[in-house]
Design a protein with these regions (language model features):
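Bacterial N-terminal signal peptides that target proteins for export
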Residues: 1-7
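N-terminal signal peptide c-region/cleavage motif recognized by signal peptidases
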Residues: 15-17
Length: 222
């Protein structure tokens, strides 16, 4: 019930936009509103507001702002939302649908942090096994420096924690915009090639480039 109340507030938050929209922002908001509905457009406006207001924050503050924003959305499995076993939604599709699974939460956070200027070398999308839930899961890892332990942004546990504190997660592989790693331990892993080896990643990037939107099979927008 509490999450529903928070999310309802997110839907209404940008009813009066308090920042100057650039052309891309305005086009995204209009496109999403026309495709998914007015409330969806307001969520995109709220996202752009977070990006604008977070621009001058420290990197750790940016992590917190982005993690908190996206964790307000609903968790729904791909088969229930998209009618597919596995579908990686773009950030606009995620916000437009008001729901997504762990990959959608992580992808939206990753691209927002990249937009906020965090170097790709510091970020990874990490595919893990959630031991307690006995299912595969995805989180975002942030490395403050090349040799440091990462912290994890997650939708299951909303508190940003060091990877060593997440004994409930077993890493499998990780990737970012250019590289793919196999995870042999809770560290950085072994380089296994380019992220272009991942078909779902390539499909996602193509849809982002063309700003293509797909419609979910079920409406979670209130």
């Amino acid at each position: 019930m509490r999450k529903r109340a928070i999310l309802f507030g997110l839907f209404l938050l940008p009813s009066i936009v308090t920042f100057a929209l650039n052309n891309s922002d305005a086009q995204w908001i209009d496109k999403v509103a026309n495709f998914y509905g007015e409330r969806a457009g307001k969520r995109v406006a709220a996202w752009r507001n977070v990006v604008t207001e977070s621009a001058e924050l420290s990197e750790l503050e940016k992590l917190s702002a982005v993690n908190n924003f996206f964790n307000q959305l609903y968790f729904v499995n791909d088969i229930d939302l998209w009618g597919k076993k596995d579908y990686w939604a773009t950030p606009l599709e995620f916000l437009g649908s008001a729901a997504g699974d762990c990959e959608d939460f992580s992808i939206a956070k990753y691209f927002t942090l990249r937009e906020l200027g965090i170097d790709d070398k510091k970020l990874r999308l990490v595919y893990v096994k959630a031991i307690k839930l006995n299912q595969f899961h995805m989180v975002v890892a942030y490395y403050p420096s090349p040799s440091s332990e990462p912290v994890l942004l997650d939708n299951i546990d909303p508190e940003i924690k060091q990877a060593s504190k997440r004994r409930d997660l077993l890493p499998v592989y990780s990737f970012n915009g250019s590289r793919l790693w196999l995870m042999k331990e809770r560290g950085r892993g072994e380089l296994a090639g380019n992220s272009s080896r991942l078909g779902l990643w390539n499909d996602l990037r193509a849809r982002m480039g063309s700003v293509k939107l797909n419609r979910p099979i079920k409406n979670y927008d209130g």
